[in-house]
Amino acid sequence: MKNIGQAQSDHVVETVKRAIPLVLVLSLLGAGLSYEIYSDALSVSAWPWRIGVLVALVCCAGLLFVYARYRGSNDLYAYGLVMSIGTFSAYYLFGVFGYFCYFMFAPMPAVVRWPGLIGGVALNFFWAMVVRRSVRHTIDATPFLDKVINEQGGELIYDVQQGATEFDRFHKEPDIMPKFAKYLIFGISPFYLILNRVLSSNFGSNGVLLFLAVLGMPLALLFVSLFVRNYILMIALPKQIEKERGKRVLVAG
């Protein structure tokens, strides 16, 4: 494969350089807040901040691997890996720290903890499946691919900016929070607050965390959408095209 990094900007390296500080800020912010809340204020567990540090280390290691393995290639697959790692670090802050750490580690009765955990996992999984089906429909049932994959000099080129524009044109984005889900979540929030007050002596410190968890879930689902979209368009799809045509897909734009 021709190394187009000499003639064009190295999009993989540029994206890695932008992603590393973003990953560190998001994951270490979550780790620092976790330490203050769960290790210091509540004194319940050191695992929340350890998880944040672990996320920072794993994400940075993944970015460095992509840099070492794919620099100079402008491979869309590598670009997708970087975008997915950055998206996951954002999901960690709102989904893992904001929601799941609360229901896993904050003092609360089991009747509150387990529905929150199981419901959160189920909602994330369900939403990922909804987004996957929607994105696959856009790829398989619209002219999207013909618009964004261009052959230039025997190479397949995917323009990121054009791809985003065309995807928004053909894709019908599912509503992250349908009306019934909004009513359900914001309707049960007062119930959880009342239940915590009745059954827990730590309501004062937990109430703010509960509101953060409830308000953070829609943002977490947004990053689930972005992660699934990036994975399909920039990781799975390039590999599928490479298998079918025998050519890698390169990134431009």
Where are these regions (language model features)?
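Juxtamembrane/interface segments at transmembrane-helix termini
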Residues: 70-74, 125-147, 223-249
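Cytosolic/matrix-facing juxtamembrane and C-terminal tails of multi-pass cellular membrane proteins
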Residues: 1-18, 155-174, 225-253
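N-terminal first transmembrane alpha-helix
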Residues: 1-122, 205-216
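Loop-to-transmembrane boundary segments
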Residues: 9-26, 81-88, 159-192
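Hydrophobic alpha-helical transmembrane segments in multi-pass integral membrane proteins
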Residues: 93-102, 157-166, 191-197
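Hydrophobic membrane-targeting alpha-helices
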Residues: 31-32, 36, 130, 134, ...
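C-terminal transmembrane-bundle signature of multipass membrane proteins
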Residues: 175-253
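Charge-rich cytosolic interhelical loops and cytosolic tails of multi-pass membrane proteins
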Residues: 1, 87, 111-179
